[in-house]
Amino acid sequence: MPARNPREAIPVGELNHAIATMLERGFPLTWVRGEISNFTRAASGHWYFSLKDARAQIRCVMFRGRNQHVDFTPREGEAVEVRAVVTLYEARGDLQLGVEAMRRAGLGNLYEAFLRLKEKLAQAGLFAPERKRPVPSHPRSIGIVTSLQAAALRDVLTTLRRRAPHVPVTVYPVPVQGAGAAQKIADMLDQASARRECDVIILCRGGGSIEDLWSFNEEAVAHAIARSAVPVVSGVGHETDFTIADFVADVRAPTPTGAAELVSPDRGHLLGLTRRAGDALVQSMRRELDRRAQHLDWLARRVRSPLAQLQERRARVDNLARHLRSALRETVVAQRHRQQLLAIRWTACRPDMAAASADVARLSQRMQAAATRTHERQTQRLARVAGALELLAPQRTLERGYAVLLDQRGRALRSPAELRAGSVVEAHLADGVADIAIAGVQAKLGGI
């Protein structure tokens, strides 16, 4: 306030403004404790009330932009703590508190205890990410640690029945608030872990005040979660509520329902995956069957009938016979040609007729003997080849007591697997054909 003449009068509004400025500058934001009195919610959404104790009271105002963050509605006589600035309502000259935040009395101590325990457990490594265990994607059984009277239990069971009705659920009943609740929760977690009935445990309860949720901020519960042999999912309170149990748990869900959704596989999704996998398997089997059928067709084209083999062998014998006859003719022609050459040479040289005649006679005999020997050797070779071919002929095989079986389409049958009881096959014997009805089929175990 600027300096003035002490005898000069100042307006009331200017005085009140100066006082308000001094108060706001002289008193920073301060926590004040007292009881609610004369609480009023204006149509604008602002709160007006008085804060009092046994010695005094002071008016308070909390504007809507601030009070919408308070998680409870103050009641007459309720003990609260407010964070406020001291100011003056200039229009009336009333001293008041401009409230920025509000909490129930005593919550400040609880919050400080919460922070101290959180720091202690963090230093002990209970919040370390490497300690967290993965939640099984398809649990065989699910455990729930909560109160039987909790609305959260009904929400969790409803969600599990909807998403995974095939998964059995075990409920471990325990009080979730009140004296001794924390130790009972810890004991039940130890029991559920020791029994190993479940693949995952849900620790849950519905929303409430910080006092209602305090059992989940106790050190005993934190250590029980940490030493559990079974993964623990916390679903405590609402999404904005955080407890020590949330930090220690392997996974924190925003709500009990969220915890149930997190641990349960969606049955519809699993059925869809199964159907798609089945369709893929059917397609794969069809492709494999088509491939094998194509391979069988290729093999069938390569298999020749006994008649075709017989015709091929006959053609080979005929070819060998032609070659043999040709070789004999060529030998005779060569010898005759040599004889003619000798005769020409004899005529040209006019040798001694008697000696020449003797030579000719001798050579003629040798030539005849050589031709005879050559003919005999070729004849013997032809006989051996013909005998070998005769042994290989299918007709000889049939004459030794064997038979060729053909199906109704004329295909040769090679395996008992191609026969069916009651079917009729055509048996080719050495000197005839017979139709045979198959009475039964038996695989060869060894030997004939």
Curated annotation (Swiss-Prot):
Supply the gene name: xseA
Q: Where in the cell is it found?
A: Cytoplasm
Instruction: Please give the InterPro entries that the UniProt record associates with this protein.
Output: Exonuc_VII_L (IPR003753), Exonuc_VII_lsu_C (IPR020579), OB-fold_nuc-bd_dom (IPR025824)
Native species: Cupriavidus pinatubonensis (strain JMP 134 / LMG 1197)
The reply on keyword Transmembrane is no
Q: Which UniProt keywords apply?
A: Cytoplasm, Exonuclease, Hydrolase, Nuclease
Read off the PANTHER family from this record: EXODEOXYRIBONUCLEASE 7 LARGE SUBUNIT (PTHR30008:SF0)
Q: Name one GO biological process term.
A: DNA catabolic process
Matches recorded under HAMAP family:
Exonuc_7_L
Q: Does the keyword Cytoplasm apply?
A: yes
GO molecular function (one): exodeoxyribonuclease VII activity
* Catalytically driven reaction(s): Exonucleolytic cleavage in either 5'- to 3'- or 3'- to 5'-direction to yield nucleoside 5'-phosphates
Role: Bidirectionally degrades single-stranded DNA into large acid-insoluble oligonucleotides, which are then degraded further into small acid-soluble oligonucleotides.
What GO cellular component is one of the record's annotations?
cytoplasm
Cystine pairs annotated here are: none
- Which family is this sequence assigned to? Belongs to the XseA family.
Q: What is its EC number?
A: 3.1.11.6
On assembly, the entry states: Heterooligomer composed of large and small subunits.
Name this polypeptide is given: Exodeoxyribonuclease 7 large subunit
